[in-house]
Amino acid sequence: LYTILNNREDIFAERVYAPCRETGRLLREHGVSLATLESDTDIVKTHMFAFAITHELCFTNVLYMLELSGIPLRAADRGDDLFRWPLIVAGGGCAIASEPLAPFMDLMLLGEGEEMVPELCDLVIKAREEGWSRSRLIEEAVNIPGVYAPSLYTHDANGVLTPLKPDLPTPGRRIVADFDRAAYPEKQVVPFGAVHNRLSL
C-alpha cells in the first residue's frame, strides 16, 4: 500500500508508529503531537489516519496513538466537520474481527486493501475538494466494496450487524480477484537508521 499510494502524484502516504511509554510520556510533558516519520507532520494535519491492525493486542495501541495525536477517541466526538480531524480508519488482517474498535473508527476496511484503499483515497480527495461533511463522506464510502462504517450499523438482540438505513450494503470482505494485475512492491520499505548503530556490552 505504501508503494501504491506514493506512486501517485496526488497522495503522500507516510508512516507513524506507536512510541514506547517513555517517549509517550515525554511527548505529553512537552505538548508535542505524534507525527509522521518521513516529514514530521502532525497527525492532526493529515487527511486520513489509518491503522494496520495485525492482531487484537493492537487495539489499545490505536487508542494510545489517537490520544498522543490529540484526536478525540470516539468517532461521535469528532463532529461533522471533515476538515477538523483526520478520517480515522482501521484495516489489516485483524480488521475483520475489530468490532471492539467500532466506537473509535470512522471506517473499517475489511479484506485486501490494494484496490480498496486507492478508491477510498479518491473519495476523500473528492470530498475535500467539494466541501463535504464528515457524515456524507462516511455514507458514500460504504458503497466501496469492503468498507464498513460502524456508525451506520447496529446489532440486533442476537448480535447480528443491522444497517440503520434500509439502502445500506451489507459489509463484506474485499478480495483482489486478479493477481496478474495486482500491484507488487518493487522497493521494500526500510528504516531510516541502522538497528545495530550502537556498542553492545
Residue ranges and their predicted role:
Residues 19-165:
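Glycine-rich beta-alpha loop elements in corrinoid/cobalamin-binding modules
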Residues 156, 160-201:
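N-terminal [4Fe-4S]-dependent radical SAM core
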